[in-house]
A protein has these predicted regions:
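C-terminal binding/interaction regions
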Residues: 2-8, 17, 22-26, 39, ...
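Amphipathic, hydrophobic secondary-structure cores in small proteins
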Residues: 29, 34-67
């Protein structure tokens, strides 16, 4: 197991290890688009609210599973969530400027 210092500023190996462990624990075999999911959660965290990011990630996973699962379903749900977050932020910005 890596020590705490290894986790600070070096997300790559930690994320890879965590995702592998989580997939094993959850009994799933799926390639994870880490950059895409992190981009989506960034848009949600900054455009909506920080707590909305993990909740939206859950909803993306649920939507993908409901659509039959697989990388394409995840990518589509992820794309929709990211676009919604961008629209949400733009609409809120317009409301505040009025």
């Amino acid at each position: 197991m890596r020590d705490v210092d290894a986790r600070i500023g070096d997300d790559g190996p930690v994320l890879e290890d965590w995702i592998a462990a989580a997939k094993t624990e959850l009994g799933i075999d799926l390639d994870v688009d880490v950059p895409g999911l992190l981009d989506m959660t960034r848009e949600v965290a900054h455009g909506v609210a920080r707590p909305a990011a993990p909740l939206t990630a859950f909803l993306v996973g649920y939507a993908a599973a409901s659509a039959g699962g697989g990388p394409e379903a995840v990518a589509e749900a992820n794309r929709k969530a990211a676009q919604l977050a961008l629209r949400w932020a733009a609409e809120r910005s317009e409301e505040l400027s009025e």
